[in-house]
Amino acid sequence: MTDSEHSTTGSSRVKRGLAEMLKGGVIMDVVTPEQARIAEDAGAVAVMALERVPADIRAQGGVARMSDPDLIEAIIAEVRIPVMAKARIGHFVEAQVLQALDVDYIDESEVLSPADYVNHIDKWDFTVPFVCGATNLGEALRRIIEGAAMIRSKGEAGTGDVSEATKHIRKITAEIKALTAMSRDELYVAAKELQAPYELVAEIAETGTLPVVLFTAGGVATPADAAMMMQLGADGVFVGSGIFKSGNPERRAAAIVRATTFSDDPSVVAEVSRGLGEAMVGINVADLAAPHRLAERGW
């Protein structure tokens, strides 16, 4: 679909440009207007409004849905930075509601309970840019085809264990690098294996990068975690439970922002890592049974 074909719903150029504005920054999960203010004061480029952080969603179980509109509107009213909110995978009406609430970005999120196990949301139908998760390049490309303006490597949300985030960002960047060395014939085969259009695969092979920004998420809990994600090739970082489940949220939030900005300077990362109090307790991903691995939601 060309930009002119969906000019009434927002072109891909505009949506991707809005996502590009967040590059190099930290996006923080918040569950109250007060937390949103802390995130903004710490230097977050955006906040994700939700009723429960992923650690609580994981601990409490049950069906996790879109947040209450009153909460979302209260957070929007509290801060000047962009506000994101989550919709369930495939739940296009939740996305319609979020767009009506004037959120700045919609995250079609595996952290919430999927509403459709076959179809993701057709994101071309919306003016609001979408964020979508991916564990590998094929998954990322399928979301881009559907209209996603930002990809985040999934990691394993709500654990405080950065190992899955490391695995997913490494896999995506390695698969992109592999495309750049392929011949045209090999790219045709790769496109088939990735279940993506040849034209998109060829574009990535030529540029060596996705056509949208690539953030990372899931388990980032310390300044060093954030800096490592940036050094591994992320354009920015999502931080969920790691801040407001820690001993000193204000200080940790500011430290993670600074470590993200100065990710290539170990002396800065060392300095901001001092005196942060206890990090979130966390869960080892290796101890999670397959049904409890949120990153496996989506296809």
UniProtKB/Swiss-Prot annotation:
Name of the molecule in the record: Pyridoxal 5'-phosphate synthase subunit PdxS
Record flagged with keyword Glycoprotein: no
Biological-process GO terms, alphabetical: amino acid metabolic process; pyridoxal phosphate biosynthetic process; pyridoxine biosynthetic process
UniProt GO MF annotations: pyridoxal 5'-phosphate synthase (glutamine hydrolysing) activity
Gene that encodes the chain: pdxS
Pathways per UniProt: Cofactor biosynthesis; pyridoxal 5'-phosphate biosynthesis
UniProt: D-glyceraldehyde 3-phosphate binding residues: R170
Catalytic residues (positions): K86 (schiff-base intermediate with d-ribose 5-phosphate)
PROSITE patterns: PDXS_SNZ_1, PDXS_SNZ_2
UniProt: D-ribose 5-phosphate binding residues: D29, G158, G219, G240, S241
Pfam families in the record: SOR_SNZ
Catalytic activity: aldehydo-D-ribose 5-phosphate + D-glyceraldehyde 3-phosphate + L-glutamine = pyridoxal 5'-phosphate + L-glutamate + phosphate + 3 H2O + H(+)
Assembly notes: In the presence of PdxT, forms a dodecamer of heterodimers.
UniProt record similarity statement: Belongs to the PdxS/SNZ family.
UniProt keyword Lyase, yes or no: yes
Role played: Catalyzes the formation of pyridoxal 5'-phosphate from ribose 5-phosphate (RBP), glyceraldehyde 3-phosphate (G3P) and ammonia. The ammonia is provided by the PdxT subunit. Can also use ribulose 5-phosphate and dihydroxyacetone phosphate as substrates, resulting from enzyme-catalyzed isomerization of RBP and G3P, respectively.
Gene3D superfamilies assigned: Aldolase class I (3.20.20.70)
InterPro entries named among the record's database cross-references: Aldolase_TIM (IPR013785), PdxS/SNZ (IPR001852), PdxS/SNZ_N (IPR033755), RibuloseP-bd_barrel (IPR011060)
Record organism: Leifsonia xyli subsp. xyli (strain CTCB07)
Enzyme Commission code: 4.3.3.6
NCBIfam families noted in UniProt: PRK04180.1, pyridoxal 5'-phosphate synthase lyase subunit PdxS
Alphabetic keyword roster: Lyase, Pyridoxal phosphate, Schiff base
